[in-house]
């Protein structure tokens, strides 16, 4: 009210994200740690959920729809070139496949059918009878219709889609709370350039958290068979591995499972 902003703006995903950043900065400041000064940057062009480009700006939703619906790579490249940097355009066009919402929806329906309501209530973010609403919505024929049916002011579509990920990954409220309270227990290296490699050496020598170049240094395939014996750091990483497997299942027949065990960090030439 003091800023004379429309109330609906407070419920937009980027606003929520900004507020969480401010909250985290406030916590760090109370601990006496130096924090950067936050800056509010006005969004230009397309809004977060817009489905059409505005000028030279497009939302992530628009880019995903263009990628999914384009008839061929040449058409996709032509559509993307005015909207994204050349390197991003090349990366999108060169990608061979993307997760299929229809496949995700079939996994979701089975998960809902095979989990008791009491079990659903233990999933992060599911409360206030939402599990019953989800069970009633599984007869909708598509992922988008399922999400649309559950969407409300309290549960925007982006939140519903996050809850779907939580459910498919069996993200237990109690376990996630333990992870949140513990904070990061390792640093996983995904990519680096020559400068990053030097920085990683310093982190390895001075930092308090272990660096993971390969997941096997913390969790091997045998460990995954005995989740009850895992420590908290291993449980964190196993959830990461499960997320990669979920994406592979959504890609279809050509994707390999357990890709986290197949790839080393990417080295980028300067």
Role assignments for model-derived ranges:
Residues 1-270:
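Active-site cores that bind ATP or allylic diphosphates and position pyrophosphate for catalysis
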């Amino acid at each position: 009210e003091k800023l004379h902003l429309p109330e609906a703006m407070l419920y937009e995903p980027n606003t929520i994200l900004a507020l969480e950043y401010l909250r985290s900065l406030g916590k760090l400041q109370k601990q006496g740690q130096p924090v950067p000064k936050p800056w509010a940057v006005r969004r230009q062009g397309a809004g977060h959920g817009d489905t059409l480009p505005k000028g030279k700006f497009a939302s992530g939703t628009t880019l995903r729809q263009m990628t999914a619906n384009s008839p061929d790579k040449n058409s996709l490249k032509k559509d993307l070139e005015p909207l994204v940097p050349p390197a991003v355009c090349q990366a999108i066009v060169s990608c061979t496949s993307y997760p299929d919402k229809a496949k995700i929806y079939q996994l979701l329906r089975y998960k809902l059918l095979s989990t008791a309501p009491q079990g659903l209530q233990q999933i992060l973010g599911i409360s206030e009878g939402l599990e019953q609403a989800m069970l009633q919505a599984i007869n909708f024929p598509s992922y988008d219709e399922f999400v649309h049916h559950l969407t409300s002011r309290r549960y925007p579509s982006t939140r519903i889609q996050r809850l779907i990920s939580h459910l498919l990954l069996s993200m237990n409220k109690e376990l996630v709370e333990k992870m949140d309270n513990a904070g990061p227990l390792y640093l996983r290296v995904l990519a680096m350039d020559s400068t990053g490699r030097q920085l990683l050496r310093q982190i390895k020598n001075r930092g308090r958290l272990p660096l993971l170049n390969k997941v096997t240094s913390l969790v091997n395939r045998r460990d995954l068979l005995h989740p009850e014996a895992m420590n908290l750091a291993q449980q964190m990483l196993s959830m990461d591995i499960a997320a990669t497997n979920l994406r592979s299942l959504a890609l279809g027949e050509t994707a390999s499972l357990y890709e986290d065990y197949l790839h080393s960090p990417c080295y980028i030439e300067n």
